[in-house]
């Protein structure tokens, strides 16, 4: 979630992760962001996008896609909403954009605020989540991360044409004890002991 709301995530955490990626010199890293508009001003997305775009200048990480939290962070089993996020992340389905800030402004002009931003992807960046990829989900609150994590890494939903991928899936906190194969950076039982994240090597990636 791309904001400084501090309820589900914080942009400072993202900036720290981006610095870590540079330290490890990791290739082919893509950012798929969810706009907020609920815990912060409903039209503050442009500011946060600009902040990260500036941060990424000359960096390995590329800003690949945007979608509102209404779709990507549903928690009420509205799978038709989650499907829009899944298809953006996995199949690159959405509206092409050459400039996310301009595209957000266009949405604002149409009365669509950050929470409800429709899926869009950077037209000059061909990035989608594929089998064998590493995924790092940096939200720290658990409730609104479960459904998108479930469809990406846990269970198939044939009715909505969503099936999990074979991913090295990493979360900042433990979203659900029942999830299989998910790596947790800061586990709830003893958060002090989880102060070092072991990243895959270039060979693993």
Outline where the language-model segments fall:
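Beta-strand elements within well-structured catalytic alpha/beta cores of enzymes
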Residues: 1-4, 30-32, 85, 134-141, ...
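Gly/His-enriched, cation/cofactor- and phosphate-binding structural elements
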Residues: 143-190, 194
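A structural micro-motif
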Residues: 27-29, 61, 167
